[in-house]
């Protein structure tokens, strides 16, 4: 019994380290993306940056959840609240991106080229799958729906990186102004789905474990 408790504490500590890294990485990623996106007028890049800031919120709530892992009642209560906070944040972001991307499409407003955005998307494609896999292992070992949801969130960030990179490259290479708002619009249902599942408190990461 004591050995199992100590092992669980060790796993929870590993989860905390992953969330500290998530907060640090996504703060940097979000700042670079939002600043570069604002300078280039890229809604997909700004949306990607805001998604990174939501991951910061998610990381902070997961740290909060991990801090009471030994207390079953508080753990379950924090677990549900963590999922809802992340879910609401996702829905708000989906609404914002949908509005801005449709506005840009109707106004035929394309962004300027963003080398910083392209580099950021490539780096994110390397970092996020590794982070998602590590979180998924911790979530599986702890039986934590909130950690599993956060792992899935990191995995979806990889998908968003692919969409972002595609839009930026198409615009840079072919001059397709509509590629950026279209990329942002494609992100919207993915983000909204994650938000709805978070609010419902669903464990979204069985495949990540």
PLM regions with names:
Residues 1-209:
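Alpha-helical transmembrane cores and adjacent cytosolic helix/loop segments
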């Amino acid at each position: 019994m004591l050995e199992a408790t100590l092992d669980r504490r060790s796993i929870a500590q590993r989860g905390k380290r992953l969330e500290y890294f998530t907060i640090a990485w996504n703060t940097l990623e979000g700042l670079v993306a939002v600043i570069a996106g604002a300078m280039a007028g890229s809604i997909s890049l700004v949306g990607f940056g805001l998604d990174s800031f939501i991951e910061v919120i998610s990381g902070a709530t997961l740290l909060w959840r991990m801090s009471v892992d030994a207390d079953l009642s508080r753990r379950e209560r924090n677990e549900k609240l963590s999922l809802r906070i992340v879910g609401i944040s996702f829905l708000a972001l989906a609404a914002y991106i949908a509005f801005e991307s449709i506005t840009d499409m109707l106004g035929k407003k394309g962004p300027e080229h963003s080398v910083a955005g392209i580099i950021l998307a490539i780096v994110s494609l390397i970092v996020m799958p590794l982070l998602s896999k590590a979180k998924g292992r911790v979530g599986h070992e702890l039986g934590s729906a909130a950690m599993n949801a956060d792992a899935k969130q990191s995995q979806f960030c990889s998908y968003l990186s692919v969409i972002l990179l595609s839009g930026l490259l198409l615009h840079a290479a072919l001059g397709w102004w509509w590629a950026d708002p279209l990329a942002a619009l494609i992100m919207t249902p993915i983000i909204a789905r994650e938000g709805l599942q978070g609010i419902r408190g669903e464990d979204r990461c069985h495949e990540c474990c």
